[in-house]
């Protein structure tokens, strides 16, 4: 159940590639002084231009203090030097959705910001190493959580690790502390650990994987190195 046929995975990958092309184009256009609303609208426009049938969900563009809210709605806040900017977005192709998140930096980052970024990155990588057929969604989530704990950010991770993606943007299975699912070959799952310090900033790094018998295949091709917009 919730296993994807190869042709379904192909459509999800097509949606994902559209989103990634739009993101790489957006990176050339982002500059301080633009509003979150402007950035979100630009990303949605580029996805449409590259063949998306419509956005997968309302694009999140959350900068500075707003990045500390996992479900932030774009505002008129302007991007400033020293901000983190979290972009969570997806395209659709023939009814199938994609989902990815990258947190980037506007101008220079502090050592504390870099540490949070690295903690979330390693939580993402460690969870992806653990994901394979027949482990539970609960275990996958706990791997990311223990990595964040080790870095001192565990208490700032206030949501589940991930969810299925398909004809809906949120589907089974789930990976969270309360997940009842066992992962099976062919399931698609997001891997999206985050850390959010209220009143300061937050980071989330999200990839989409397909579960295999001996691991998982990442459907996301975009770098996870910290991108800094100068």
Residue ranges with predicted function:
Residues 3-230:
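Active-site neighborhoods and metal-handling regions in enzymes and metal-associated proteins
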């Amino acid at each position: 159940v919730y296993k994807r046929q190869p042709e379904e995975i192909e459509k999800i990958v097509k949606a994902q590639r559209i989103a990634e092309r739009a993101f790489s184009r957006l990176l050339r256009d982002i500059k301080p002084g633009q509003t979150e609303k402007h950035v979100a609208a630009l990303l949605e426009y580029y996805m449409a231009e590259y063949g998306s049938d419509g956005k997968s969900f309302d694009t999140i563009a959350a900068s500075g203090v707003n990045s500390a809210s996992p479900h932030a709605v774009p505002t008129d806040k302007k991007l400033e030097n020293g901000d983190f900017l979290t972009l969570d977005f997806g395209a659709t192709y023939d009814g199938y959705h994609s989902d990815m998140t990258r947190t980037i930096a506007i101008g220079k980052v502090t050592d504390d910001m870099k540490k949070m970024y690295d903690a979330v990155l390693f939580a993402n990588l460690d969870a992806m190493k653990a994901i394979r057929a027949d482990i539970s969604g609960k275990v996958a989530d706990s791997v990311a959580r223990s990595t964040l704990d080790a870095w001192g950010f565990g208490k700032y991770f206030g949501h589940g690790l991930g969810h299925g993606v398909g004809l809906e943007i949120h589907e089974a299975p789930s990976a969270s502390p309360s997940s009842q699912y066992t992962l099976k070959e062919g399931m698609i799952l997001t891997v999206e650990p985050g850390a959010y310090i209220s009143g300061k900033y937050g980071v989330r790094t999200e990839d989409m994987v397909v579960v295999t018998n001996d691991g998982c295949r990442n459907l996301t091709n975009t770098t996870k190195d910290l991108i800094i917009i100068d």
